Regions:
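Sec-dependent signal peptide hydrophobic core
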Residues: 5-9
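C-terminal motif of bacterial Sec signal peptides marking the signal peptidase cleavage site
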Residues: 14-16
């Protein structure tokens, strides 16, 4: 399931118009709406020359872990195929995602996943838009219609994201008994200048909608932006505090798309969706139970096409050994446009 959703996220991130304004401060692009017919996009859904037709991800030893191929006709993507590989190079699974549209807006996506061991999974996700903004999505499992995941978005009066509510039926154990309930993730957003604060609550409620307060977990995030790039993220719970800082190049990020913002209103919480490409990432985790601190640093290297879009991305982990700084290759991504 995680691989299926990851495939959709990557695919959705790549669809759409790539225009952005070179304004300073926080998020200065249009707020999660498709381009109008009279703007300089000409109402087109897909850009020309910057849309990756194929993306290949490779492990540290150069073997392909998975690759995505997109079927684009005219100004819309009709389908995308994702193939996952085992370590020995053989195919582990295939996912075919097909899209239908209502005008310029996606209406439905169907997922068909097949594994070499004979297991198959089918999903359907529908989208609902109100006043040009995504209002809700519904993900249904064809083999289990009860397991329907819904996501509802609400917005402040200025059009900025206010809340994301995710509800997913699950089975859990209570007092030694297996019971059906609903797992809820509720995230509230506030916007102050170039900082967005998110308060995330996770809890269970029964099928009648009664909340179980004893299972509530609370996490607070802050996102700081500069020139449409996410430069700092903090995450805080009762158990730990984490800070991640990013730096960027001045080139074009193929994942920075208006359509991504339309289909994923909380796109901004992932640095991979920033305007430019990540150069460095430093994460510092502090744990309360033993007062320990763990620091991880990564460096990104690219080759670029003539239009300043990346052809390859390599991610290295930085470490120091006997006073000497070293880099270890973690993964490589290759883009074909």
């Amino acid at each position: 399931m995680k691989k299926i959703m990851a495939c959709l996220v990557i695919m959705a991130a790549l669809i759409g118009c790539s225009k952005s304004d070179d304004q300073g401060g926080g998020l200065s692009t249009p707020e999660n709406t498709l381009p109008k017919k009279n703007d300089d996009h000409g109402g087109k859904t897909l850009p020309k020359g910057v849309f990756p037709k194929k993306i290949a991800h490779k492990t540290e030893n150069g073997n392909i872990s998975y690759e995505i191929t997109n079927n684009v006709q005219g100004e819309k993507i009709l389908s995308t195929t994702s193939i996952s590989y085992k370590r020995d190079g053989s195919i582990e699974s295939k996912i075919l995602i097909s899209f239908s549209y209502e005008g310029d807006y996606p209406k439905e996506a169907t997922y068909k996943r097949s594994k070499t061991n004979g297991e198959n999974e089918n999903y359907t996700e529908t989208y609902s838009f109100v006043d040009g903004k995504l209002k809700n999505t519904t993900l249904k499992h064809d083999t289990n219609p009860r397991a329907t995941k819904t996501t509802t978005y609400s917005y402040h009066n200025d059009g900025k994201l206010a809340k994301v509510l995710v509800e997913e039926p699950r089975k859990s154990s209570l007092n030694g008994q297996i019971m059906e309930d609903i797992y809820v993730t509720e995230t509230d957003y506030t916007h102050t200048g170039n900082v967005i604060t998110a308060t995330e609550k996770r809890y269970f409620k029964d099928t009648q909608g009664n909340k179980r307060d004893e299972n509530t977990s609370l996490t607070t995030y802050t996102y700081t932006f500069e020139n449409e790039n996410l430069i700092k993220v903090t995450e805080s719970t009762t158990e730990y505090y984490s800070t991640t800082e990013y730096t960027y190049d001045e080139k074009n990020n193929p994942l920075f798309q208006n359509f991504k913002k339309l289909m994923d209103p909380d796109y901004f919480n992932d640095a991979k969706n920033s305007k430019n490409n990540i150069l460095t990432r430093k994460t510092t985790d502090k744990y309360n139970y033993n007062s320990s601190t763990i620091v991880n640093e990564h460096v990104y290297e690219y080759t670029y096409a003539d239009n300043n879009y990346p052809l390859t991305q390599k991610i290295f982990r930085k470490r120091t050994e006997n006073g000497v700084e070293k880099k270890e290759l973690g993964e490589t991504t290759e883009y074909a446009y």
